[in-house]
Amino acid sequence: RDNTYSPLALYFILDNNLIESRVEINELFNILIEETNLKKEINNLMIYKKALYNADLATESELLEILNPLISSKSVWKSHALYLLAEYFYSKNEKEKSKEFFNEIINIKNANQDIIKKTKKRLNRDFSD
């Protein structure tokens, strides 16, 4: 539960497919997020990475539950979380939900500039009337 080596160890495990069980990987994410003394934004990054790891197979409610701490905060990772949700709903052909999340990104004060660019491009390309 070292705040430097624990995240690095998890990245190594993921990069090298050393553990195949999604349950075990999620347990490791939970230990990092809940029991390791990480700086606030590093902890938020772990939450985001957990969501990325689970996005392909997660249900809507599971993904929202994972990302809720970010989307209800002022974290620098909030725009990333909203973008992930927007893309998730777009991939599920839920265009209105997707558009809502894309629009929310535009209104965030500390949103990542690359995310804002991608969002505007996506809104213009896929949601303009």
Predicted feature locations:
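Soluble extracytoplasmic domains of inner/organellar membrane proteins
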Residues: 17-18, 28-129
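Extracytoplasmic/periplasmic/luminal assembly and interaction segments
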Residues: 1-37
